[in-house]
């Protein structure tokens, strides 16, 4: 297998592994994680933001965790699963931007690794600023 075929596969492996890795560990809670929990829980129960309950930010931040609550159940680990999904999407979007710009494949793999370690991997709990950026 040539490196031109191997490097895109390596990029995807890096993105998925670094996004899913925090699910397998006991991670420390982030401050104010209850905001993610409560908003997603209320949405998953059918309540509407700004009508049934107040939110400090826009309502779309809680949609993905609420969908994951419906699929996987209302548990704290579900917030990590939702964030892993968002991290995979953000990594693939970053990879797509690099491909569109025409970055050298070796530089692209290095950039994806740096992005995943410095940005995506550190945001393993749902956080408003990260989700809005994605």
Where do the PLM segments sit?
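Short helix- or helix-capping micro-motifs
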Residues: 108-118, 134
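Membrane-helix interface segments
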Residues: 75-76, 101-109
């Amino acid at each position: 297998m040539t490196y031109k075929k191997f490097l895109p596969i390596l990029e995807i492996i890096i993105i998925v592994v670094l996004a899913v890795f925090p699910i397998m560990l006991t991670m420390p809670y982030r401050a104010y994680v209850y905001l993610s929990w409560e908003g997603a829980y209320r949405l998953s129960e059918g309540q509407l933001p700004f009508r049934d309950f107040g939110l400090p930010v826009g309502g779309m931040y809680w949609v993905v965790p609420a969908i994951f609550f419906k699929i996987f159940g209302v548990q704290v680990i579900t917030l990590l699963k939702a964030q892993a999904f968002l991290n995979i999407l953000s990594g693939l979007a970053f990879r797509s931007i690099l491909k569109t710009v025409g970055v050298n494949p070796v530089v692209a793999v290095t950039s994806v690794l740096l992005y995943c370690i410095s940005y995506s991997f550190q945001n393993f709990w749902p956080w408003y600023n990260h989700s809005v950026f994605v």
